[in-house]
Amino acid sequence: MSFQHKEIEKKWQTYWLENKTFATLDNNEKQKFYALDMFPYPSGAGLHVGHPEGYTATDILSRMKRMQGYDVLHPMGWDAFGLPAEQYALDTGNDPAVFTKQNIDNFRRQIQALGFSYDWDREINTTDPEYYKWTQWIFLKLYEKGLAYVDEVPVNWCPALGTVLANEEVIDGKSERGGHPVERRPMKQWMLKITAYADRLLEDLEELDWPESIKDMQRNWIGRSEGAHVHFAIDGHDDSFTVFTTRPDTLFGATYTVLAPEHALVENITTAEQKEAVEAYIKEIQSKSDLERTDLAKTKTGVFTGAYAINPVNGEKLPIWIADYVLASYGTGAVMAVPGHDERDFEFAKTFGLPVKEVVKGGNVEEAAYTGDGEHVNSDFLNGLHKQEAIEKVIAWLEETKNGEKKVTYRLRDWLFSRQRYWGEPIPVIHWEDGTSTAVPEEELPLILPKTDEIKPSGTGESPLANIKEWVEVTDPETGKKGRRETNTMPQWAGSCWYFLRYIDPHNPDQLASPEKLEKWLPVDMYIGGAEHAVLHLLYARFWHKFLYDIGVVPTKEPFQKLYNQGMILGENNEKMSKSKGNVVNPDEIVASHGADTLRLYEMFMGPLDASIAWSESGLDGARRFLDRVWRLFIEDSGELNGKIVEGAGETLERVYHETVMKVTDHYEGLRFNTGISQLMVFINEAYKATELPKEYMEGFVKLLSPVAPHLAEELWEKLGHSGTIAYEAWPVYDETKLVDDEVEIVVQLNGKVKAKLQVPADATKEQLEQLAQADEKVKEQLEGKTIRKIIAVPGKLVNIVAN
């Protein structure tokens, strides 16, 4: 008989909620364990089977740690601001708050149906004013410290939609929605100075227990490079520009320079003859994204401005070009070109017939750029030197002559923090008519997002909030000065930068969280989520955390001590699950047909947690069959406990039980859930062969199963005669002495060929092994008519009889 999963799961889910079984104890006597999931965006589509993979992993750890005596913090919440809800509101005219609440209710229902041991009293929602009050408070602190500032930044402006689009919403120069043309246009935007933390974000990665691949992605994103700034005067002008180069030693090889088309100097230095060509080129590249412009594979384009720069090292005139591969937002927006020793410069020079000079020996620069090390030539005071010495010498010369200086730069840009959207946290700043700006006073937070019947683009590039005049227009009660509220909102990243801190003290009206509680719970012990957040979310969260550390709010430099990325669950055809492919598996259907415990067990048993694996219905059926076998081992068809279960421990199953406790504990701790479950299966197979089932071992098994299949385990625990929940029962421990084999298997060989296998006492001596081998019936048969010449016995391994 199989167990009735619908009844059992409903029964225990109701019990856990009513009894607040998983409420965090906040008990300072106990060691803490903080297990965190990347909280989901509550989409209209609901949960898919990929979500529970990571959630089950943290749940197994949380349940085990509670049983091991830890005080466990295991919370869940909603990253609920964001574009889809706004888009829904634009399309339907409905309030995104209503849509978001429906989605959250659905997500919560689905998550509770999977039996995760979350403390629901700590549930948070980034769109709740009591939550985003503190998101706004952090912004004010950044603003006070000069880390939030306004700058003119090129953005993706779509005239037809009357709005600014994120890079992800632009495909081949057109809007993803409706395919309207998109152009780059400078606009005032809020920026956060993450670059001020670049070195610390880089250095502190060393202290984290994170996958090396994720650390590398962050290192590359930060992109620290050492080199020099070189100043170039412009011939016939008072202006000059600066370039950054990692190879200042090749300065003698520069044959032209390139400015970004948006560079402030372009208009001023372009000659009358080149004006038309330059303006046409700038217009042509306006719709290109930064990614398209810097694509290494594309054909190089550019236009000569007619102006020349002076090479500071030798006074040579170098033509100044503009080209789209140089970005105004990156570095200084200007580069010196050394085509003999840089591949991109070489390609550009060949395309436009510009000269190529050799200044480092080692290749044939007429055919290809030589980027390796070598002796410097045609380089005056650098001749004969190799790369490192030449770099040091030329930097010393640049600094001495005031033509440049040593410089460290980063690929990391400051974080563009404003969005021209309605559905986000309002930025608490007021711009006054006299040109000044002030922050909304702390005591007036939260600055609540106003309700509106009409969420539509403003048409000016401002957010839809600009349409709500009564909210936007303010008057200073003291001076009568008129002002306008900031109409940009924060990006979705803002709420997820610090949510793990609010879980620690979610209802505190006076502080982001109490210092004592932060001291107790930080850092997060285990953070599990998808690798797609490897860079942005994790980098932004680390930045905010370091800032909060600097102002004394949090006690740790880093938020997440251990990070783990679960793999992806693919469709049965090994393709990514997506609505368009029609291969999405809905967990609701699996919970109805197979049960939540089966889904949890199957997702953990599919393979290693970090691997991407295809969904398989037969695998799901196999997981259910195992749980049915467990049920039938304990419960007779009559519903009574199996009569073979006897009080106490006893020798039956002793060794396999202790081995199971050891392996399952070790595998769960190491997130190797698939091998932990395999060992549970080994135990069940052995138990089916046994004539009696010692109760102590059967109860221990139920405890080991409970983190993976908690509903079934609770029901079996009750059937074994216990009242209340298994959740805080002591985790089993193993006895090492019980793991030693009393017997071992040895092979018996005749003239080197295996003839028999014997079970012998583990401590049998050579003499005993010789006697046991010769006494075996099979061996006797083989020896008939032969004379034994020699016997070699190796205790614990083999006996080899030489006979003829």
Curated annotation (Swiss-Prot):
Keywords per UniProt: Aminoacyl-tRNA synthetase, ATP-binding, Cytoplasm, Ligase, Nucleotide-binding, Protein biosynthesis
Motif 'KMSKS' region located where?
Answer: 576-580
Q: Name one GO molecular function term.
A: leucine-tRNA ligase activity
Which Pfam families does the record match to this protein? Anticodon_1 (PF08264), tRNA-synt_1 (PF00133), tRNA-synt_1_2 (PF13603), tRNA-synt_1g (PF09334)
Biological process according to GO: leucyl-tRNA aminoacylation
Tell me the compartments it is located in: Cytoplasm
Q: At the top level of its lineage, which domain of life is listed?
A: Bacteria
- Record-given protein name: Leucine--tRNA ligase
